[in-house]
Amino acid sequence: MANNRTLARRRRAFSPLTVVMLAVTLVAFMGVPLSSTGAADAADPVESVEANRRGYTSYGEPPVAVGTSEEYVNSSELAGSRDKGNAEAEEEAAEVETDVQPSSVTIDTEERAAPSQVQVQQERMEEADDAPKPVPVRSAVPSTVAKRQQARHRVIGTAVIAAVVAALLWKFSRRRSGAPREGGENENGGEEK
């Protein structure tokens, strides 16, 4: 009967523990390349959104519009369309001015000349938003010290994982092969002869 149990154990190639160990090893080794790509050093998405809103790329350079050139901007077609738009805007402004009656407007000339504090603050905020601001730029290429540290961590992590896997596989292979266990007991629970 004991002989049948031993044969049944030997036939079973993968025990649940072996499958779990292989899965953990696979995940650990897949994690090493992912962590070595420097994913943690990638630019913060919030920073890139702020930089784009200010008109700068994540590298601190102003964005380059694709397909535009000075020739196109200065072309007669574009200038002509601008003139048409300005002429229409001036006509509308003239119509609006004629619609307003002087008796309905009762603003002192002093109030009209001095801008309010709110207007001054709004103008300052607009000027501050329009001014190009230096964007903190993270280096796209990691320094040699960072590369060495990544390589060292990768080697240490791989060595630790390999040592743990080797120790577990050695322990379970000895147990499966019928080698005597510690304490001199065999698989049947009796003393070895």
UniProtKB/Swiss-Prot annotation:
Bilayer-crossing regions: 14-34, 153-173
InterPro entries cross-referenced by the UniProt entry: Gra6_protein (IPR008119)
Topology with respect to the bilayer: Multi-pass membrane protein
Keywords, ordered alphabetically: Glycoprotein, Membrane, Transmembrane, Transmembrane helix
Glycosylation sites (chain numbering): 4, 74
Chief localization: membrane
Family statement drawn from the similarity comment of this UniProt entry: Belongs to the Gra6 family.
Protein name: Dense granule protein 2
Origin species: Neospora caninum (Coccidian parasite)
Gene that this polypeptide is encoded by: DG2
